[in-house]
Amino acid sequence: MADFTHFNEQGRAKMVDVGEKPVTVRTAVAAGRVLVNRTTFDLIKNGGMKKGDVLTVAQIAGVMGAKRTPDLIPMCHPILIDGIDLELSLDEERLSVEIQASVSCGGRTGVEMEALTAVSTAALTVYD
């Protein structure tokens, strides 16, 4: 099991030590899509959902999700996020909500999981 980075010699889970890695600028982009029916699409587009402005709430939820990534994903390092840009848009042709997150930091490990968590949380919020 020594070939796997998240397991020690005894096969037990461990968090990888990134202390010796240099601090560099890290950026990750993730995207997702939530498909909806015509009625739901029109309600989202026209602000008619009972829960309010779906896109704004989902955008905030995505940012919050990115910030909570190490609480959700085992062995994910807590990092100091420098920025999160989350964009949600409506695609009339696909009847979908398009979601894209860009996350950046200066650190020793990447921000891919934070970008993916931002998109996932935003998508779940749209669906809710």
Feature locations, PLM:
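C-terminal binding/interaction regions
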Residues: M1-L55, I60-H77, D82-D128
